[in-house]
Amino acid sequence: MGKIIGIDLGTTNSCVAILDGDHARVIENAEGDRTTPSIIAYADDGEILVGQPAKRQAITNPKNTLFAIKRLIGRRFEDDEVQRDLEIMPYAIAKADNGDAWVEVKGKKMAPPQISAEVLKKMKKTAEDYLGEPVTEAVITVPAYFNDAQRQATKDAGRIAGLDVKRIINEPTAAAFAYGVNKVKGERKVAVYDLGGGTFDISIIEIDEVEGETTFEVLATNGNTHLGGEDFDNRVINYLVEEFKREQGIDLRKDQLALQRLKDAAEKAKIELSSAQQTDVNLPYITADATGPKHMNIKVTRAKLESLVEDMVKDSLEPVRVALKDSGLAVGEIDDVILVGGQTRMPMVQKAVADFFGKEPRKDVNPDEAVAMGAAIQGAVLSGDKTDVLLLDVTPLSLGIETMGSVMTALIEKNTTIPTKKSQVFSTAEDNQSAVTIHVLQGERKRASDNKSLGQFNLEGIRPAPRGLPQIEVTFDIDANGILHVSAKDKETNKEQKITIQASSGLSDDEIERMVREAEANAAEDKKFEELVQTRNQADGLVHSVRKQITEAGEALPADDKTKIEAALSELESAIKGDDKAAIEAKQQALLEASQKLMEIAQQQAQAQGAAGADAGQSSSSAKADDDVVDAEFEEVKDDKK
C-alpha cells in the first residue's frame, strides 16, 4: 500500500506532507519551495500554469489567472460573499446552470473544484517526485467552518485530480495534530486560532496523552469562511487606489493591469510591515493619461495598516468567544494557544490573540506548514502506519430539516462529535398527504430560509390518513469527513428514500467523470510535451556535437561526406523547430548514419592524440627518473627491537 499524503489546500498557498518515520515532513515542490501559491493560469498557447509560474505572469494576464478559488468552492452565485468578490476579482465569476458560482476563462465556464484540482495535481506530482512512486490517496484539509457543500466540492476536486480522498479533516484539528503528536504529555486544552488567506477558524481542542496514546477531542469550533489575508490585502489595495486618486485624479479600479500590480504590491507591503514600521509602495508607470506616464510612490506605515484592518481583527474574536462558550471552558482554562495561517504573522493579530487569552501564543508551530503536517499524520493513522492517535472531531453547524411554518428543526446540533447518526419521527401537515418533501438545512437560524439549503428529496406513497397520523422517520448520518447522508422512511409501509447530500447544486457524478477525463487528457498532453522537449534537447546536443567534430576533422573529412552531413544537419534543424517528435527522431537517426565517416575520423584522431601523449609521457618520465631519486638515511630494525 502506498503512502497517504496530507494536503493543505489553501486559499493563498497550498502545501503537501508525508509521514517520514515518526515525523511529518513537508515536501519541496519543483521550484524548491515548501509552499505553492494556489494560483492557476491559462496561457494563450493552451498551457495550464500552476503555482509560482502562474503568479509570475499574473500582471500581464489578469483575466485568465485564477486565485482565491477556495472562496468560491461549494458556493451559490447569489451568496453575499460571492457578490462581494464579483466587484474585486479581475477574472470573471459566472452563474452555472445549477446556480453555483463558477468562473469563466476564455469563454469557457469552469467549476471551482475543477480549478482546485489543478493545484491538487501539482501537490500529487510533488509527492510522487519525492517518493519515486505513484500516489493515489490523500487526506485533504478544509476550514472547520466549511459547510457540507464546501466539503463535498473539495472531495470532488480531489477526485478530478486523480486522488482517492480518504478523509476530509478540519484545518485547526490538523494543526493540533502537528503540535500534539509525540510532544504533549498528560492533558492539555488548546485553542487553535487559524487565520489563513481566505478563511478563519477557531477550535477548542482537548489533547490527552495516556500511556503513549494521544486522544484529540474537539470540544467546539466556530469561524468565518470569508475572512482572511485576501481581505486584508483588499483593504490595502483600496487605500492605495484612493490615495493615488487623490494625488493624480485617476481611478485605477478601471485598469485591470494596474490592479494586478497593486495586488502584488499590497501583499508585499503587508508582509514587510510585519517586521518593519513603514514601507514604500513604489510602482513606476502604473498608468498614463494625456500628460504622460504616472508613477505611484506611497508610504504605508504599520500604524496605517493596523487602522485599515482593525475591525477585521476585532471581528475574528467574536467566533472565539462563541467557541469558548460552546466548549464550556473559561479563558483561563486554556493551556496553549496555537496560531495557524500566514496572516497570524501580523503583530497586531498576535497581540489581539495574546490579550484575549492572557498568554503568549506558541511559537514552535510553523503557521504555513502545520496543517499539511497534521493531514499527513491523519493519513498515517488511516493507513495503519500510526496507531497511537485517536481523533474525535465535530460537525461545525447544526443540521436539520424544514418543518411546518418554515422553521428549521435541528436533528444534529453543532459541535456534535462525528461520525454520528440521529433519527427523529415527523408527520404530515395535511390530511391525506401522500408525499412529503424533506428539505435538508445547515445553520443556526430558526427561519428555514436563513440557513444553507443542502438539498431536498421526496418520500412518496404515504397511505392516506389524517394529518399527524403517518410516522415518517428521518435519519441523519454524518461520516468522518463531515459529509451528510439522509434517509426518510414511512414506518407503516417501510418505504424508504436515501440520499447523500450533494447540495441543491454541486457537481453530478457525470460532470465529475467528464472533468476527470479532461484532467487525464491534460496529463497525457503534458507528458507528450515533456517528451517532445527532451527529444528536441537531445537533437540539439547532437547538432552541436557534429558541428564541432566537422571543425576538428578539417581536411580529413572527404568533401562528399561533408556535403551529406551538412544536408542531414539542415534537415534535423528544421525538424527541431516543429512539433513532430517522430520526425525529429528520424532525422536524428539519419544524421547519425550520415556522420559515420566523421565518427571514424574523430576516433582515429583521439587514438593518435592518445598515442602521442603516451610517447611524450614515457620520454619525460625516463628523463626525470634520476632527478626523482632522493638519498635517504635509514636504520636497520633488529627483530629484538620490534
From Swiss-Prot:
InterPro entries: ATPase_NBD, Chaperone_DnaK, Heat_shock_70_CS, HSP70_C_sf, HSP70_peptide-bd_sf, Hsp_70_fam
GO MF assignments: ATP binding; ATP-dependent protein folding chaperone; unfolded protein binding
Disordered as annotated region, ranges: 601-642
SUPFAM superfamilies documented for this protein: Actin-like ATPase domain, Heat shock protein 70kD (HSP70), C-terminal subdomain, Heat shock protein 70kD (HSP70), peptide-binding domain
Matching Pfam families: HSP70 (PF00012)
Keyword vocabulary terms for this entry: ATP-binding, Chaperone, Nucleotide-binding, Phosphoprotein, Stress response
Similarity annotation: Belongs to the heat shock protein 70 family.
Annotated protein name in UniProt: Chaperone protein DnaK
Organism: Aeromonas hydrophila subsp. hydrophila (strain ATCC 7966 / DSM 30187 / BCRC 13018 / CCUG 14551 / JCM 1027 / KCTC 2358 / NCIMB 9240 / NCTC 8049)
